[in-house]
Amino acid sequence: MNQISPLAYVHPEAKLGDNNIIGPFCFIDKNTVLGDNNVLQNSVTINRGARIGNNNEIFPGASLSTKPQDLKYKGEETICEIGDNNSIREFVTISRGTASKGTTIVGNNNLLMENMHIAHDCVIGSNIIIGNSTKIAGEVVVDDNAILSAEVLCHQFCRIGGYVMIQGGSRFSQDIPPYIIAGKHRLK
């Protein structure tokens, strides 16, 4: 049985699994799917197109499946797919896809720290840590087991290989191969 605060709004067309906790001032839009055993603390926004798995904890101020910040987006129906066992911290924003790929994907067992952003059509793998205030532009791929420290800026269309570790404050505009420790100055 779901525990939904009387101060939360859940659209009648939203599909909820079992044993979810939805805190006060949460908003769950139509055309959304929420699996089982998720915890939405207060003031979480789940916009249309969200497909959220099981056992995720989503903290205050997070906004998932937001309208893409892409001028080519014309309102087409797209998706933001989030897997299982993720910790999505305060004020994280994740955009849904555009016509380019149609879906933004976040895998399983990730820690997305506060105030970070994942843009449209990104593919974020599993077992990834993304630090505070990191910004990932559109259509970026982050392979499994990568660590992006705080305040990393990632240009669109880049690929970050598996097991990469990126130092805080770094910015880059090209792919980073797997098993690399990268950092500080602009990566070329």
Segments and roles (model prediction):
Residues 185-188:
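Conserved beta-strand-loop-alpha-helix hinge in the C-terminal portion
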